[in-house]
Amino acid sequence: MVSPGLDLELSFSQALQGFGFSPEVARLLWLPLPMLLVLVAAVVGVLVSVWLERKISAAVQQRIGPEYAGALGVLQPLADGLKLLVKEDIIPARADSLLFTLGPVLVVVPVIISWLIIPFGQNLLISNVGVGIFLWISFSSIQPIGLLMSGYASNNKYSLLGGLRAAAQSISYEIPLALAVLAIVMMTNSLSTVDIVGQQTGAGILSWNIWRQPVGFLIFWICALAECERLPFDLPEAEEELVAGYQTEYAGMKFALFYLAGYINLVLSAVLVSVLYLGGWGFPIPVEWLAGWLNQPIDAPLVQVITGTVGIVMTVLKAYLLVFVAILLRWTTPRVRIDQLLDLGWKFLLPLSLVNLLVTAALKLAFPVAFGG
């Protein structure tokens, strides 16, 4: 049995009503909070990821890395952000200023909005719309438009080539990514991220989808790295060929938005892998045992707080383990050529994801208990 955990909206409403606010006013005050929580979670995730990348990269190269900005350099990402914030915002003379400004916004906004459907507990998510996976795929398809727009509007050959590469890469890897997720949806009979995690809670770690979908897991992770433009798939901004790709003409906060979107997307992809394949917030011990040890009913506030906290910690730990793997891959794999990138997507991952989907359908019919019949 899974504890219902914390209900953010209900808890917030009850707290305000305790101070004398009416339910209508409490509801009105709740409305702006989800996006604020999403922004805070995304920014904190980026700051932690940037610091980890700097320190892990330094360790791989036998360097110390940042150490002066705060203890162990933990304030270095914040210092970098402040530096970009005060830099001059330059628009090239022959650039399309409207599209040049709109491009970075179209890149970062869909990634931030995608956090709305990420669950950290049974009720510990911003928006349980029931079709969270569909929404995430829809939002992710907007990003290539912003990348191509940025490259085109810069009026620079390197920027345009980088934008075209980014769009081609994103389109090539979105299809096998969606097919890998479709196999999970088929087993769960739901597009809800909450239902997908709930389906993995029956037998602890043995219930995780990674054991039933090992091929789908690998397809999803490879495609996620390509969508995030991480090595070995960072062709849109290959320094030796394209200066900085679609980012070449950008400076200041517009450049920072690309930087921000890349790391938010990396953390988002890692959290989604945790949710889809690694049991999400899955509690390491039965909730009934915890409630009995605390001598509390299973729906007691204390039990809910503990299970909610542990659920968040479990989800974040699994996600940052994958971020650690992505950072190591940056320094241990060479960049692929553009023809190799497209061949991998269209000639290998796409057929493999189709076969994986068909095999999952067959196993669902043959073994309905194990594969969600």
From Swiss-Prot:
The EC number on file is 7.1.1.-
Q: Where in the cell is it found?
A: Cellular thylakoid membrane
* BP-aspect Gene Ontology terms: aerobic respiration; photosynthesis, light reaction
| Bilayer-crossing regions | 28-48, 98-118, 129-149, 177-197, 205-225, 267-287, 309-329, 348-368
Which PANTHER family does the entry mention? Answer: NADH DEHYDROGENASE SUBUNIT 1, NADH-UBIQUINONE OXIDOREDUCTASE CHAIN 1
Function text: NDH-1 shuttles electrons from an unknown electron donor, via FMN and iron-sulfur (Fe-S) centers, to quinones in the respiratory and/or the photosynthetic chain. The immediate electron acceptor for the enzyme in this species is believed to be plastoquinone. Couples the redox reaction to proton translocation, and thus conserves the redox energy in a proton gradient.
Q: Could you say which protein family the record assigns here? A: Belongs to the complex I subunit 1 family.
Q: What is this protein called?
A: NAD(P)H-quinone oxidoreductase subunit 1
